[in-house]
Swiss-Prot record:
The lineage of its organism: Bacteria, Pseudomonadati, Thermodesulfobacteriota, Desulfuromonadia, Geobacterales. It comes from the Bacteria. It holds the Pfam family Radical_SAM. One of its GO terms (cellular component) is cytoplasm. This is Lipoyl synthase. The keyword Oxidoreductase does not apply. [4Fe-4S] cluster 2 binds at residues 61, 65, 68. Its EC number is 2.8.1.8. Gene3D superfamilies: Aldolase class I (3.20.20.70). The gene is lipA. HAMAP family: Lipoyl_synth (MF_00206). The keyword S-adenosyl-L-methionine applies. PANTHER family: LIPOYL SYNTHASE (PTHR10949), LIPOYL SYNTHASE, MITOCHONDRIAL (PTHR10949:SF0).
Length: 294
């Protein structure tokens, strides 16, 4: 039976007091995070632990996806000093694992690939021990851009599939097959590189559609997977169609692991970079943290 009202397991509280220190640090370095721009429900938990997913290439997106809270406007010029500021934050926070992502920049010839590569280089120079994960857009299928981020040699290179083919109309300008081909190309260019993707549940997908998407991902040898609950940022966004139970997420995780994914995070509050440091640890999944009481 589908649940269409927000259930009790999705009542995690946000604590602004937990944000103050991190927001001062990020503001001082003129940096953005997807945690803030996407109104992530895990922001208090992650900021309390001094973790953040850095949003480079500005905070304005050129696409109009109906599920996303990132602002859609004509972006500003690329800030070439941004990689060094991200690296400074990584060093100050003493991060052992960092995730860097961006809005889609269809206005740029390379989609922002060069700045991704520069950011990897800056982090590696400032904090050589930090594991670097990139979560990149599709670069409009530009193979030179994909090759550029692969050549930067992040430890993990992610690109989110987001949903099943039937529902791809919610992804403005995106193409299901193009995203799969991108993940396949990454592995072809560097067979040792770990690829990662994420899907949102509750958009109206069927279980068989989800499992077919997982089979498609295994066919392109995708290594890591995240499955999380879609939560509409506002009433003007695409409405939630269903709230799968925590037990359903557990079952999906076991199904995905049985298909050959090396690590799967699956739960209502799972997001692409949630517990990112646990991928590749050999545990299969992390124990999810309880919702903070404050």
């Amino acid at each position: 039976m589908k649940i269409t009202r927000r259930p009790e397991w999705l009542q995690k509280k946000v604590s602004p007091a937990a944000h103050a220190d991190m927001e001062r640090l990020l503001g001082g370095l003129q940096l953005h995070t997807v945690c803030q721009e996407a109104h992530c429900p895990n922001i208090s938990e992650c900021f309390r632990q001094r973790q953040a997913t850095f949003l480079i290439l500005g905070k304005l997106c050129t696409r109009l996806c109906s599920f996303c809270n990132v602002t859609k406007q004509t972006p500003l010029a690329v800030d070439q000093a941004e990689p060094e500021r991200v690296a400074a934050a990584v060093e100050l926070l003493k991060l052992t694992h960092v995730v860097v992502t961006s809005p889609t920049r269809d206005d740029l010839a390379d989609g922002g690939a060069a700045l991704y590569a520069a950011t990897v280089a800056a982090i590696r120079n400032a904090s050589p021990q930090t594991k670097i994960e990139l979560l990149v857009p599709d670069f409009a299928g530009n193979q030179e851009s994909i090759a550029a981020v692969v050549s930067a040699c992040p430890h993990i290179l992610g690109h989110n599939l987001e949903t099943v083919p039937r529902l791809y109309s919610i992804r403005s300008g995106a193409d299901y097959r193009r995203s799969l081909l991108m993940l396949e190309m990454i592995r072809r260019l560097n067979p040792a590189m770990k690829t990662k993707t994420g899907l949102m549940l509750g958009l109206g997908e069927t279980e068989e559609e989800l499992f077919q998407a997982l089979r498609d991902l295994r066919r392109v040898d995708c290594s890591y997977l995240s499955l999380g609950q879609y939560l509409a940022p506002s009433r003007s966004h695409y409405p939630v169609q269903d709230y799968p139970s925590p037990e359903t997420f557990d079952r999906y995780r076991e199904q995905a692991l049985s298909m050959g994914f090396e690590h799967v995070e699956s739960g209502p509050y799972v997001r692409s970079s949630y517990h990112a440091e646990h991928y590749g640890t050999g545990t299969g999944h992390a124990k999810l943290s309880p919702a903070p009481a404050d």
